[in-house]
Amino acid sequence: MIRDIYDVIVIGAGPVGGYLAWKLTEKGLSVLLVEEHPEIGRPFQCAGMVNPSAMDRIGAYDTVLTRIWGARMYSPSGTEIVIGDPNTTRTWSVCRKLFDERVVQLSLDSGADLLLSSKPVSANVTKSGVEISLDINGEIKQFQCRMLCGADGAHSWVRRTFKMGRPKELLIGFQIEVTGYPGEEGRLDLFTGDEFAPGFFAWAIPSGNTTRIGNWSLPNKLGEESCEDLLQVLMKSSQWKGRFSNCKEVGRYCGPVPSGMIHKPVIDRVAVFGDAAGLCKPTTGGGIGKGFEQVDLMLPKLVEAISTNDFTPSTVKNLNDTISTLRRNQNKSRALRNVFLTESTDEELDELFSVWSQPEVIDLINQLGDIDNPIPLGMKMLKDVPEFRRLASKAAAALIWG
């Protein structure tokens, strides 16, 4: 039964909101999850990738469509690099609806309450808590909580309402789901080229009986074209049209990718998590794993603050400090991405691929490559691969200072 007063109200019942609610209820706190859509896991707005560490936390292996252990990467001119070890899982391609439902169900089984077709209308922080009005199927009702948490995505209502700033980067992604793509089981495909993914890459991810094909970039690199337009350029290009000629579209998705943590994810009695905080990885756009990591890092001090109803400035500062490593690592990952990809011309990318294709470099990638943490591999290549040393000065400041 839905109550009027909770310890925590979480706006957004996606995987990060569900995970947060689960962990808080496990600690004995009362939690209300609020989801604006009539069902969990819809609409679907990402590539459906869950990294191993995130999957280990949930154990939702029955939601897996394909285990990804390797990749085929292509330079703008078509140089192919094949990486991966079938014995090492790099990431999981999942059914996001089932995965999201599984995470939210964990929170419900642990004692959280859930409101569907509901959204916040207004909220006000007081000395003792947060007063919030929710629109529940068209009816406005009042609630109170000690803390309000936003896990409500790139355009977070919580973040905007409390003027918590904007993520450093807001990229745009577009994806279609198709049948008929001649992929290789267990390997995803990555395509680089300014014509169809300026500064970034396009992908083809095996997902059970279908393949998810998409691209992403920064708005200022797209000019007057959309990611959808540029994806068609890839699929119809003389170089790659044979790869896509038998594809039949069965679904499409478009959405923002916020990457660059906001200055203070916690203010007063309000906190934002995951995409709402700008936590997507600058190298892949993935956000679930980093959102889970944020929750785990903040959890002990978060539970203490909520339990004691202590949200003094020093407590809030301590909460923000718990995730400072996430910010530094995100900045370093972005610096490496810029050096090796975003700031490179097609000609420079072809040169980089000619180095990456060397057997000793592929061995290094297979040894140190980590979809969660590209920093060790990037640092090792800058240090040990002679052809990459000229890039080191470009990345030095960001890599050192984060």
Language model: regions and residue ranges:
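Glycine-rich FAD pyrophosphate-binding loop
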Residues: 22-44
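C-terminal helical "tail/cap" subdomain of flavin- and related membrane-associated enzymes
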Residues: 303-402
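Beta1/beta-strand and adjacent pyrophosphate-binding region of the FAD-binding site
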Residues: 2-14
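N-terminal Rossmann-fold NAD(P) dinucleotide-binding loop
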Residues: 17-18
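A short alpha-helix-loop-beta-strand transition element characteristic
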Residues: 41, 57-72, 165-170, 313-315
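A conserved beta-strand/loop capping segment in the N-terminal third of enzymes
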Residues: 51-104
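Predominantly flavin-linked oxidoreductase catalytic cores and closely associated redox partners
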Residues: 13, 106-242, 278
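FAD/FMN-dependent oxidoreductases across multiple families
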Residues: 222-302, 306-307, 317-318
